[in-house]
Structures are given as structure tokens and as C-alpha cells.
């Protein structure tokens, strides 16, 4: 017998940056940037975080700058 699919619409995630009216994403604000990085140190995609395209681009630039300055790790050794 074929299984029936139970589908429901997933609630859209809210853009944290737009919701909190953050105009400038500073690379020195590591607490904000850590919200958008996985435990392995990878940048989380938009579909996971719910950020808009423009804010995701700004986040990516800020995270990469923070990594180069040594404020954030490139990879995490936690297992």
C-alpha cells in the first residue's frame, strides 16, 4: 500500500538582522556573527538562518573579514 504524505507548510524564518533593525553588520561584533556560523565554523545558508539575500551577502563579507583579522576561526576543532 502506498504511504500517504502528510504535508504542512513550514513557517518562514524571520530575518534576525532586519527584525532587530541592524543597519551595519560590523566584523568586530563576533557575538552577532557567531549566530550565523555552524559549530564547525561554516557559514550557515539562508534557508537555515532565514536572512534575506542582501543581509546574507553583508554577513558573509563580515564573517570573512573577522576570520582574516583572527576574530573568528576558519574551522573549529570541536568534535
Curated annotation (Swiss-Prot):
PROSITE patterns: RIBOSOMAL_S18 (PS00057). GO terms for cellular component: cytosolic small ribosomal subunit. It holds the Pfam family Ribosomal_S18. Part of the 30S ribosomal subunit. Forms a tight heterodimer with protein bS6. Gene3D superfamilies: Ribosomal protein S18. GO terms for biological process: translation. GO terms for molecular function: small ribosomal subunit rRNA binding; structural constituent of ribosome. Binds as a heterodimer with protein bS6 to the central domain of the 16S rRNA, where it helps stabilize the platform of the 30S subunit. This is Small ribosomal subunit protein bS18. Transmembrane segments: none annotated. It comes from Enterococcus faecalis (strain ATCC 700802 / V583).
Amino acid at each position: 500500500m502506498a504511504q500517504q504524505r502528510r504535508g504542512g507548510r513550514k513557517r518562514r524564518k524571520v530575518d534576525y538582522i532586519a527584525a532587530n533593525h541592524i543597519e551595519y553588520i560590523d566584523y568586530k561584533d563576533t557575538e552577532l556573527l557567531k549566530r550565523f556560523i555552524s559549530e564547525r565554523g561554516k557559514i550557515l545558508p539562508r534557508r537555515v538562518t532565514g536572512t534575506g539575500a542582501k543581509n546574507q551577502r553583508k554577513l558573509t563579507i563580515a564573517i570573512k573579514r573577522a576570520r582574516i583579522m583572527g576574530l573568528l576561526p576558519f574551522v573549529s576543532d570541536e568534535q
